[in-house]
Amino acid sequence: MIIMCYFILTLLIGLMTSKGTSNKEFHGARLGVAAIVCASAGEWLGGTATTGVSEYGFIYGISGAWYTIANGLGVLFLALFFAKIYRSIGRMTIPGIIEHVFGKRAQIVSSILLVIVMLAVGMSQIIAAGKFGQALLGLDFRVSAIVFTCIFVLYTLAGGMKAVSSTNTMHLFVMYFGILTAVIILIVRLGGWSAFTGAISLIDSQEGTRHLSMTAIGFPKVSSWVIASLLGACTAQAGIQPVLASKDIPTARKACIYTALVTAPFGLLTALIGIVGKVMSSQGTLVDLTGNVVTDGKLALTSVMMTLPPVVGGLVLAAELAAILSTASPIILAAGTMLTKDLYQAKINTHASEKDLLRVSRVTTACSGVICCIGAIALVNNNNVLDIVYSAYSLRGALFVVLIYGFLWKKANAKAASISMICTGVVSVFWVLYKIITGAYLIAPWFTETYAAVACAAISMLVLSLVFNKREA
């Protein structure tokens, strides 16, 4: 009942913001601090921040929170060093900024690559949404994915960035309130904080784990997350689009700082739920629907939720749904925006009217949602979906390396940038495919696709800029 009410409320808010939406308002225009924070936070607090981090909490402990902390550090990096530059350029998309630095050719290449990135990430959110509906409502996955996609697309098409900002305000509140309430109730139920820490310390002494250590998950994983977030935060269209739509530069910078502060702590709460699940599992009180003790971290959040009172359990479900909704909508909007601004308006119809752009924006946004849905249905049973998504994130971060060259080095040029971005895309995909086929990374176990993509971008941009030493006008 709580979930159905939440669905209806989300649609109503999205539809109410649709009245009189112009092309500029659809993509975002003159947003204030609160609107930017709520719209941007959705990019960083998706399904992985709930189910994924709770799984890390179950297995590794509180160090699983590094996932959202890394995202917060990335947004803070954007605030301190690039929010002012980006906003002063006055473009609505990352490819638009790349065009400002390198020219049209680089804009087209980057827009194609970043649209692919957005669609890959959007596909993962549709998979999460489909599985959510499958587990909660007993629907066939395909039906669940289609229904959720229709909901995402409907309210995003209705109000664009206005709808995303308005609905994400509600999503953000529900996520924090639902998860925080659950954490408090669960720890009190275990006998309070001292009893909780004592129980997990006993488990650690028996199993040789360190659930209360921030380093237990390992430096390679943490460093990979931090590097990907520092670079990716500066090229994440879904997270940056509200910033580019801010009313002025001080608003953009302030909103980024607040977004970082909102994003970073969330993983601490969901990791704690995973740790509670570990304690309950060791005590034999965390069981699945068949009565078997849960030992799989992937089931931690759902299984713990089933032990809560119905209303609180409904709030946690709503929080999980809010995390998915808050990410999926800005992602398909970002893909539609880049297709419209950086391909249609820049290449196909340079003199398009505002009415034409609004129409095309809605069509491309809807098509982005449909493509994500088809991809989700096709790949739901593929065990390598997360590898594909991480490859997309790595490519996004590597593109920022190319952009940095353009800001800081006079010899960086359009031809070098275009070829470098293509090479980086090929290397990123190859690195993931190699791991899928062989079960291990090329070169070294710690040399993930993040390092491979960044290294390729840095080296190829340096060499090619020296070879092609004239910047495109």
Predicted regions and their residues:
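Membrane-embedded helix-loop-helix hairpins and adjacent transmembrane boundary segments
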Residues: 1-473
